[in-house]
C-alpha cells in the first residue's frame, strides 16, 4: 500500500468542491444538518463530490497538537488485535480517551478510538501509516477532531 503524505494548502487554492466538502463536514459535525443529503444541498455540492473528497480533505486543526481525534478501524477478529493496536497508538504518544468495539461478526470487528494528540511524538500521517501496516487492520480513517 502506498504511504500517504499530507500537505498544508491555503484554502484559496483548493478547488471549490474540496472547500464545499469541508463545509459539509462542518455542518454535520456541528449538527447544523441532519444528513449528508441535507448538508450538501445547503452548500450546493453533489453527493458524489462529497464522497469523493470526504476522506481526503481535512481542516488544519485536525493535524494540530492538543486536539482530540476520533479514529475508526475495521479489524480482523483475532486474539490480541486490540492490544497491539493500542500499543502502537500509545507508542506514538497519544492518550486513549475512549474505546468502543462492536461485537465481532463474520470474523470482523469495528473499533472507534478517541485519542488526545497533546503528547504525540510524531505527526498524524506517520501514525496513520503505521496503523494501516498492521496486518489485522483492514481499514483506518479519521472520523473527526475537536478541541
From Swiss-Prot:
<dbReference type="Pfam" id="PF01842">
    <property type="entry name" value="ACT"/>
</dbReference>
<dbReference type="InterPro" id="IPR045865">
    <property type="entry name" value="ACT-like_dom_sf"/>
</dbReference>
<protein>
    <recommendedName>
        <fullName>UPF0735 ACT domain-containing protein BLi02918/BL01157</fullName>
    </recommendedName>
</protein>
<dbReference type="InterPro" id="IPR008310">
    <property type="entry name" value="UPF0735_ACT_dom-cont"/>
</dbReference>
<dbReference type="InterPro" id="IPR002912">
    <property type="entry name" value="ACT_dom"/>
</dbReference>
<comment type="similarity">
    <text>Belongs to the UPF0735 family.</text>
</comment>
<feature type="domain" description="ACT">
    <location>
        <begin position="70"/>
        <end position="145"/>
    </location>
</feature>
